[in-house]
Amino acid sequence: RGGRSLIERVIKESKVHVIRHLDGICHTYIHKSSKPKLCKEVTVNAKMRRPGICGATETILIDKDAIKSHLPTIIESLNQLNCEIRVEKSLLNLNSSLKLASNEDWFTEYLDKIISIKVITNGVQEAVEHINFYGSGHTDAILSEDKKAVDYFLNNVDSGIVMHNTSTQFADGGEFGFGGEVGISTNKLPPRGPVGLKQL
């Protein structure tokens, strides 16, 4: 646990297995079947409850068919909490407060009142591909009422913690009954996810 450069050096030079707690580039994916009110409440909590923790959502992925019904109220709520919102070009006309996102934003753990939003045009498979490419393997959530989409997401996102209709900030050892956590392992090898004394 620590800064990226420290962790990468330890991993590179270590002669033994290292349990690493890397960046928390967490995603919340809003599927077109999701309930707008739930999406607003969960998404705002996932970012703004504590913006500086590793379980905070850094990128919202939203189905193109959910933009009109879901996104305006989410943007309004985030604006009220002084969150800077960076979006792809197609969304800029939704609100004058929005800023243009760069490709670097998809790789960024802000740890601040900043969030990026990307439109998903080809459904859950595209969302999973984005997460597995840009994410850090920490925590990712899907907001959906579609069982097939949920099952696909939970089975294919390659992260230590995957969630359904839940804030990514729920990712904590205490919440899972592990007691106080040492960190959240983003390793492929076990232990993976929240690591408490028992897992160590």
Annotate each language-model stretch with its function.
Residues 102-200:
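Conserved C-terminal structural/oligomerization subdomain of aldehyde/semialdehyde dehydrogenase
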